[in-house]
């Protein structure tokens, strides 16, 4: 009798375990939305990994500009981006969430909204700050090349203080804080991390 109950319990646990594995295997995250004024453009969905960016999927947009991408559930935050040519929208993915993006091309890097994710709202704030810093640095390089190095150093220092205080130290365990640590600007065709891992 004891053996029968033990066998039944073991079989029950095995079935529950298999069901749990099967449900986990099918879990997905979704990135959906639309990009206006982008008919016939190729929209790339790219993963930002340790070895750089890799294309996960792509779609040629129709007149409506609707798109839908998905991927397997992630256990740790991962970073992706939506890209048409040089226009980029950064996306953070955590678990099985659905992120909804609405944008307008060709200014989609700055003219977009993101719903369904607190992390991505913060990533957007950081991306806009980065774009503004990049524009200011480019302007200084063009107008004051003799003083550009020292002025850009001050601008980057101010940026780091702002982002550290208002984003990284505020919620250090959030994905957007990790995203902030790897932001960069391009100076003279060379990318420079804003936060230098050897000094900051």
Language-model segments: residues:
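Alpha-helical repeat scaffolds
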Residues: 194-200
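Alpha-helical linker/edge segments of TPR/alpha-solenoid repeat scaffolds
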Residues: 189-193
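C-terminal motif of bacterial Sec signal peptides marking the signal peptidase cleavage site
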Residues: 19-23
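Solenoid-like repeat scaffolds
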Residues: 168-170
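Bacterial N-terminal signal peptides that target proteins for export
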Residues: 2-12
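A non-transmembrane, solvent-exposed segment enriched in polar/low-complexity residues
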Residues: 24-166
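Amphipathic alpha-helical repeat scaffolds of TPR domains
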Residues: 172-188
């Amino acid at each position: 009798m004891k053996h029968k109950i033990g066998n039944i319990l073991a079989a029950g646990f095995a079935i529950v375990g298999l069901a749990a594995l099967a449900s986990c295997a099918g879990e997905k995250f979704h990135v959906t939305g639309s990009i206006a004024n982008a008919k016939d453009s190729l929209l790339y969905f790219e993963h930002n990994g340790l070895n750089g960016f890799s294309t996960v999927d792509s779609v040629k947009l129709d007149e409506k500009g609707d798109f839908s991408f998905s991927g397997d559930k992630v256990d740790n935050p991962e970073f992706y981006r939506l890209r048409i040519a040089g226009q980029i929208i950064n996306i953070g993915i955590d678990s099985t969430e659905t992120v909804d993006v609405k944008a307008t091309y060709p200014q989609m890097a700055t003219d977009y909204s993101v719903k369904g994710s607190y992390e991505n709202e913060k990533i957007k704030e950081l991306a806009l700050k980065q774009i503004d810093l990049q524009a200011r640095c480019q302007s200084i390089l063009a107008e004051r090349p003799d003083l550009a190095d020292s002025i850009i150093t001050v601008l980057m220092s101010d940026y780091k203080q702002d982002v550290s205080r208002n984003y990284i130290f505020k919620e250090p365990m959030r994905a957007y804080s990790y995203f902030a640590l790897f932001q960069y600007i391009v100076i003279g065709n060379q990318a420079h991390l804003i936060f230098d891992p050897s000094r900051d």
